[in-house]
């Protein structure tokens, strides 16, 4: 089976000339396009080719990718095959022979001594052209030991084509290579069962045929990476690639974001007919790429969340130890941190945490919501921590047990503070504290303002008594200490007053001051507004002309009020 796969990869890397030589050697039709020639050659290989055909395939591949010639037998075999091609009817075969010999590097021909006459003859025959040919670069292995990074949202069910190098087959910039794979009846059944019909005639599959490309590097697991000018065809149909990502800076060439390619919609869901993949790309100096095809099952964010919960919740003591480590005083530092404030709001959804989660690689205590994080990466997989902007892969996520306890104990707090010993306390919002302290103050002020005028209300005509109380201090002239401007506001005003009188009575504070002097002589009552500082100057009432309308009537009312006040004081 390994030999068959190796021969198949060799045939897939052949050019038109090699395919024509192989088909002509096997007695098959060698006319047509490259796609037709390749399908005939693969069918020849699959139908059970003879050992002679297998030797011919290896021989053509050795010419196509020469490395080292081991022994004179290999040289004589190549030499005889080259000369046998001269009498062939194909017009491209002499070119193949020349190309096959010219592609041999000079370092591969070790024997220059007379002990190898065949090699010397070979060198003599091709000496003029051999000196013009430059040494070819080392050919990468067909199946490099490349490992791709695991994709959290996909479970690998089977490997259809293991990682295979995209080998540069010519000196041209644009390269092309073909790959063949077939599905088993069980694989076809799984794909068909998972099919879901979407609006518009589209189909979706949870079991998918996935194509991945990456750099042919074996040092570490590789992320998906596309070569330049990539073009993929599946069974002759062009596969639409993801769009270009915006360049980070001006002048930088745009690149497609590396991600796995779901080619299920173009795959023949039959175990009797093989599938062909054509990949063309622009070669780059110093960069080799690899491709692979897998049968995978797509997962959802809810499934990943369930798997994350099955891993268990991390012990709260781990987080407490991290808190103590952060709050431990550093003797070399002049600044000591005694507490640490942490929010219980998710930085992704700006909502209260439900499943606190963070990565093991993160050094901060702030958590984010696991459900929102998985949903975000399901739409666009970035796996970046929303707190510190560092890599937070799914495999490194943990559920914080300490934050689980805090969320269960405090349901009305959005922020907490950690102490040096690992304990915590809730942080109440300042607005709530201000509301609590301001409510009793409001009650006291309202009671003091509205209760005092009631103590001076006279049983007779209410409206007149209020006006009388306000006009009480018109003729008084004694000095008194100043009151705050806030207490000079008059809350009793008559709608029947004339406009000149209203202008004076607006600043009458007697309704506030009278109750405080009810137990003293009437002579001690502040008689006039002229002794109080006001925010602006106004004409004193005493200086007003007595010719004003109703002035005599007001003087009579003032005398009556003074007598009434004196009598009330005596009765008390």
Curated annotation (Swiss-Prot):
InterPro entries: PINIT, PINIT_sf, SAP_dom, SAP_dom_sf, Znf_MIZ, Znf_RING/FYVE/PHD
Predominant subcellular localization, coarse grouping: nucleus
Zinc finger regions, SP-RING-type: 331-412
Region (SUMO1-binding): 467-473
Stretches for region Disordered: 523-572
Locus of motif LXXLL motif: 19-23
Gene Ontology biological process terms from the UniProt entry: androgen receptor signaling pathway; DNA-templated transcription; negative regulation of androgen receptor signaling pathway; positive regulation of dendrite morphogenesis; positive regulation of DNA-templated transcription; protein sumoylation; regulation of androgen receptor signaling pathway; regulation of DNA-templated transcription
Domain SAP: 11-45
Annotated Zn(2+) binding sites: 362, 364, 385, 388
Positions occupied by motif Nuclear localization signal: 484-492
Residue ranges occupied by any PINIT domain in the UniProt entry: 134-299
PROSITE patterns from the UniProt entry: PINIT, SAP, ZF_SP_RING
Biased composition annotated in UniProt, kind: Polar residues: 558-572
Gene Ontology MF terms in the entry: DNA binding; nuclear androgen receptor binding; nuclear estrogen receptor binding; nuclear glucocorticoid receptor binding; protein domain specific binding; RNA polymerase II-specific DNA-binding transcription factor binding; SUMO ligase activity; SUMO transferase activity
Family named by the database record: Belongs to the PIAS family.
Domain notes: The LXXLL motif is a transcriptional coregulator signature.
Protein name: E3 SUMO-protein ligase PIAS2
Taxonomic path: Eukaryota, Metazoa, Chordata, Craniata, Vertebrata
């Amino acid at each position: 089976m390994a030999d068959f796969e190796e021969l198949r990869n060799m045939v897939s890397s052949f050019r038109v000339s090699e395919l024509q030589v192989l088909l002509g050697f096997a007695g098959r039709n060698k006319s047509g396009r490259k796609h037709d020639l390749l399908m005939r050659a693969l069918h020849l290989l699959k139908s059970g080719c003879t050992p002679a055909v297998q030797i011919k395939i290896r021989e053509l591949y050795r010419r196509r990718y020469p490395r080292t010639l081991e022994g004179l037998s290999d040289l004589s075999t190549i030499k005889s095959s080259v000369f046998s091609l001269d009498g062939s009817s194909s017009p491209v075969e002499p070119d193949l022979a020349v190309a096959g010999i010219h592609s041999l590097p000079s370092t591969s021909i070790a024997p220059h001594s007379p002990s190898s006459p065949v090699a010397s003859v070979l060198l003599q025959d091709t000496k003029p052209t051999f000196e013009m040919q430059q040494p070819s670069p080392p050919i990468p292995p067909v199946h490099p030991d490349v490992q791709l990074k695991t994709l959290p949202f996909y479970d690998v069910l089977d490997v259809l084509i293991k990682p295979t190098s995209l080998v540069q087959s010519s000196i041209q910039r644009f390269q092309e290579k073909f790959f063949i794979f077939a599905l088993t009846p069980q694989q076809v059944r799984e794909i068909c069962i998972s099919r879901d019909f979407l609006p518009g005639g589209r189909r979706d599959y949870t079991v998918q045929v996935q194509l991945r490309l990456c750099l042919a590097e074996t040092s570490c697991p590789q992320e998906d990476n596309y070569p330049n000018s990539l073009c993929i065809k599946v069974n002759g149909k062009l596969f639409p690639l993801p769009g270009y990502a915006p360049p980070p800076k001006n002048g930088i060439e745009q690149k497609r974001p590396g991600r796995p390619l779901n080619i299920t919609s173009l795959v023949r869901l039959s175990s009797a007919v093989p599938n062909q993949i054509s990949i063309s790309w622009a070669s780059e100096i110093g960069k080799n790429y690899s491709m692979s095809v897998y049968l995978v099952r797509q997962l959802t964010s809810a499934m990943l969340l369930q798997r994350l919960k099955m891993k268990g919740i991390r012990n709260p003591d781990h987080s407490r130890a991290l808190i103590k480590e952060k709050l431990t005083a550093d003797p070399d530092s002049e600044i000591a941190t005694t507490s640490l404030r942490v929010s219980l709001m998710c930085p992704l959804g700006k909502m209260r945490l439900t499943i606190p989660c963070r990565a093991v690689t993160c050094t901060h205590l702030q958590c984010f919501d696991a459900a929102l994080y998985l949903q975000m990466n399901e739409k666009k997989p970035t796996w970046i921590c929303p707190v510190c902007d560092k890599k937070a892969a799914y495999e490194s996520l943990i559920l914080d047990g300490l934050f689980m306890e805090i969320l269960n104990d405090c349901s009305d707090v959005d922020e907490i503070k950690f102490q040096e010993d690992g304990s915590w306390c809730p942080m109440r919002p300042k607005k709530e504290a201000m509301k609590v302290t301001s409510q009793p103050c409001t009650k006291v002020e309202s009671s003091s303002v509205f209760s005092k005028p009631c103590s001076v209300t006279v049983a007779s005509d209410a409206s007149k008594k209020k006006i009388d109380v306000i006009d009480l201090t018109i003729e008084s002239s004694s000095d008194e200490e100043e009151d705050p401007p806030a207490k000079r506001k008059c809350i009793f005003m008559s709608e029947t007053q004339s406009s000149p009188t209203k202008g004076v009575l607006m600043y009458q504070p007697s309704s506030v001051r009278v109750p405080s002097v009810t137990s003293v002589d009437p002579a001690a009552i502040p008689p006039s507004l002229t002794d109080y500082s006001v925010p602006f100057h106004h004409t004193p009432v005493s200086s007003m002309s007595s010719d004003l309308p109703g002035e005599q009537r007001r003087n009579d009312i003032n005398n009556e009020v003074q007598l009434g006040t004196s009598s009330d004081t005596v009765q008390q």
